[in-house]
């Protein structure tokens, strides 16, 4: 099947479901979802997959309005969890949630790895803050791939384990005592860290 993001006559987002037996000739089936101006306008870059016993839908709506801390004005990436009835091609979903709260996260897509993991990668480039210098031969970048799971209806995201192959400068410290809520550790340099910390309160 193919899920095509589009917009209705009133400008609100909707998703058209197409099916094919040969990936060449396609048949339109139905509108599988419509936001009716509830979640932004045009729905872009849909992704639709089963994960941990439920059906996940990810879309990237344009021109959304902020709702407290949950969304921000402009282009967002949101997800729904729900149930999909294959026979009737009916999707029943819950409320939208933000995929990522960063302002430059857009158009996430997922793949299923050969060992069965669902991995997501997205585009880091805000359309509202296009700041690429003219002399650069590239614009934007991609996120670190994330392994996805669903827990209690929420999308859980973890960096893929393969990234550990690129770790350098490992350091280990034991029995570090915190004084005034802070401690300075020697030999730590770099811009990004992955830390595992075990904390024990003194008796």
Where in this protein do the model-derived segments appear?
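Hydrophobic core segments of beta-strands in well-ordered, beta-rich domains
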Residues: 1-9, 15-17, 28-31, 36, ...
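Short consensus segments that form the blades of beta-propeller domains
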Residues: 7-10, 68-73, 136-139
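Conserved Ser/Thr-centered positions that define the repeating blades of beta-propeller domains
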Residues: 17-20, 148
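Asp-box/BNR beta-propeller loop motif
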Residues: 20-28, 86-90
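Outer-membrane beta-barrel domain signature
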Residues: 34-35, 69, 97, 135
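Short glycine-/Asp-/Thr-/Trp-enriched loop segments that recur within the blades
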Residues: 37-43, 101-104
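Acidic, glycine-rich loop-and-beta core segments that form the ion-binding/anion-interacting portion
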Residues: 51-52, 64-85
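Beta-rich accessory regions
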Residues: 75-203
């Amino acid at each position: 099947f193919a899920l095509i993001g589009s917009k209705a006559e009133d400008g609100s987002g909707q998703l058209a479901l197409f099916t094919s037996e040969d990936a060449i000739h396609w048949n339109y089936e139905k509108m599988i979802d419509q936001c009716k101006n509830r979640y932004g306008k045009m729905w872009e870059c849909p992704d639709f997959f089963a994960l941990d016993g439920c059906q996940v839908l990810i879309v990237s709506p344009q021109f959304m309005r902020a709702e407290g801390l949950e969304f921000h004005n402009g282009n967002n990436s949101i997800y729904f969890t729900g149930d999909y009835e294959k026979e009737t091609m009916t999707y029943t979903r819950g409320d939208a949630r933000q995929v990522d709260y960063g302002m430059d996260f857009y158009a996430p897509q997922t793949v299923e790895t050969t060992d069965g993991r669902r991995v997501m990668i997205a585009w880091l480039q805000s359309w509202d803050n296009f700041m690429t210098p003219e002399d650069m031969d590239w614009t934007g970048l991609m996120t670190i791939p994330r392994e996805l799971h669903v827990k209690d209806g929420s999308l859980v995201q973890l960096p893929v384990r393969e990234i550990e192959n690129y770790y350098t400068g490992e350091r280990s410290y034991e029995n570090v005592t915190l004084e005034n809520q802070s401690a300075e550790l020697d030999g730590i340099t770099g811009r990004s860290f992955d830390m595992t910390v075990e904390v024990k309160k003194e008796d």
